[in-house]
Every structure is written in structure tokens, then in C-alpha cells.
């Protein structure tokens, strides 16, 4: 089992990365002199290079477009920006330039969604994938969003209690997804694929809570895979 910080870095990043360049012992990022930034603002320093956000979103879209054509796949690819990666307004505004949808992870993310709707930056056609463990306020906020007409808000069911909790607060019918626990073999102590409904319990869970439930319709299966699937 690898437990050192360098193991986490090696697990998360591939080196070298094209964004970085060493120029006479000074590090540049997208041709930005990082030494000058540190001299100006001090260190530690965190900044966001906005053009790369759109570049990566569109790169992902091209990958999927090519794969869909290659395999004659009949479905569509919808890119969802995960708010927990950054809640900063300037980051969200850059991402939203690219015809995307949104994934939320907590109660205040729904407040952000409602603000974006008020500003006209998203609308009822925007998919809002509500992921994560749902405490009481998160349940209430999701229900409020759906009750106010955002039928494209799809809560991802993370455990056996969430359907009942949501149904108690959502007035009409609504769509759901199921988070499937990948149950991959943990190769690191930094293991994050533990949440969701286990493979063996999917059908019993569906038959018991979804199949005969007139309020909910299953629209999505959600997998979180950290280092890949082994068949």
C-alpha cells in the first residue's frame, strides 16, 4: 500500500505536463512567468488560467464525439461542470461559455444554480446532476429547485434513504440516478470509490424502491472510477 504524499501526486498527475516550461531555471506556465507572479503576490500562490478551462472542456467534447462516431453510439455526450472543483464566479462563468451542464455536491451549490438562473446564464433545459451525500438542507434545496420547475435536476441516489427523503419534499414526479459503488480494488490509501449502492444490491434496490414507485423515474446510472475498471 502506497501511503506517502508523493504517491498521491504520482497517482493524480502525469509528468511532464505540456503547460509547464523551464526557461533558464525559471518556471513558466502557459508562457506566464511564475517567478514574477510570486515576486508580486508572494507565496504560496494559487491562480486560475481561465482559457485552459474552455480548452479542456472542448477537448473532452471532441474525444467523445470521435468515440461516438467510431462506435456508432446512439446516445449523446453532455459535459457537466462539477462545482466542487471551484465555486469561484469567474471560473463558472468561463465554463458556462461552452454549452455545458452542472453537477452539484452540496446544499449551497443549489443556491448557486438558482443565482445562475436568475442571471440568465442557465435555464430549465440545463441538466443539474445533484451528487454527493444529501444532508437535510441539501434535500430541501434540491426539492425547492425541482418544485420550482427545474425538472432537469436529477438527484443521484447515494444510499437507501434518499428516495424517501426527497419524495417527502418534492410535490410531483421527478427523475433520479443511482450511484453505483464501483467496488474496485483499492490500490492506495487515498480511496474514494466507497459510496453508492453495491452491484449485488442494485436490482433488489430498484425492485423495492423504484420499479413500483409512481413518483420517480430512473434516468441515470452513475459510476465513480478512480483508477479504472477491471472486468
Task: Give the ranges of each region predicted by the language model.
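A charged N-terminal "starter" segment
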Residues: 1-174, 178, 204-207, 211-217
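Alpha-helix N-cap and loop-to-helix initiation/capping positions
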Residues: 43, 193-201, 231
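Surface-exposed loop/turn and secondary-structure junction residues enriched for glycine/proline
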Residues: 48-50, 198-200, 219, 228
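Active-site-proximal beta-alpha loop/turn segments in soluble metabolic enzymes
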Residues: 181-194, 220-231
Amino acid at each position: 500500500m502506497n501511503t506517502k504524499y508523493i504517491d498521491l501526486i504520482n497517482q493524480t498527475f502525469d509528468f511532464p505536463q505540456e503547460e509547464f516550461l523551464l526557461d533558464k531555471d525559471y518556471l513558466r506556465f502557459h508562457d506566464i512567468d511564475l517567478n514574477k507572479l510570486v515576486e508580486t503576490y508572494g507565496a504560496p500562490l494559487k491562480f486560475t488560467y481561465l482559457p485552459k478551462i474552455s480548452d479542456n472542456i472542448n477537448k473532452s467534447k471532441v474525444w467523445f464525439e470521435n468515440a461516438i462516431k467510431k462506435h456508432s453510439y446512439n446516445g449523446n455526450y453532455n459535459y457537466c461542470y462539477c462545482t466542487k472543483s471551484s465555486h469561484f464566479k469567474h471560473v463558472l462563468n468561463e465554463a458556462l461559455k461552452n454549452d455545458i451542464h452542472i453537477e452539484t455536491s452540496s446544499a449551497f451549490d443549489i443556491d448557486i444554480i438558482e443565482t445562475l438562473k436568475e442571471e440568465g446564464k442557465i435555464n430549465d433545459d440545463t441538466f443539474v446532476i445533484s451528487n454527493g451525500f444529501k444532508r437535510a438542507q441539501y434535500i430541501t434545496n434540491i426539492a425547492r429547485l425541482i418544485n420550482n420547475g427545474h425538472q432537469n435536476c436529477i438527484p443521484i441516489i447515494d444510499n437507501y434513504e434518499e428516495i424517501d427523503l426527497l419524495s417527502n419534499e418534492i410535490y410531483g414526479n421527478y427523475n433520479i440516478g443511482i450511484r453505483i459503488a464501483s467496488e474496485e480494488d483499492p490500490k492506495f490509501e487515498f480511496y474514494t470509490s466507497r459510496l453508492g449502492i453495491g452491484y449485488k444490491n442494485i436490482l433488489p434496490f430498484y425492485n423495492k424502491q423504484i420499479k413500483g414507485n409512481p413518483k420517480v423515474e430512473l434516468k441515470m446510472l452513475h459510476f465513480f472510477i478512480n483508477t479504472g475498471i477491471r472486468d
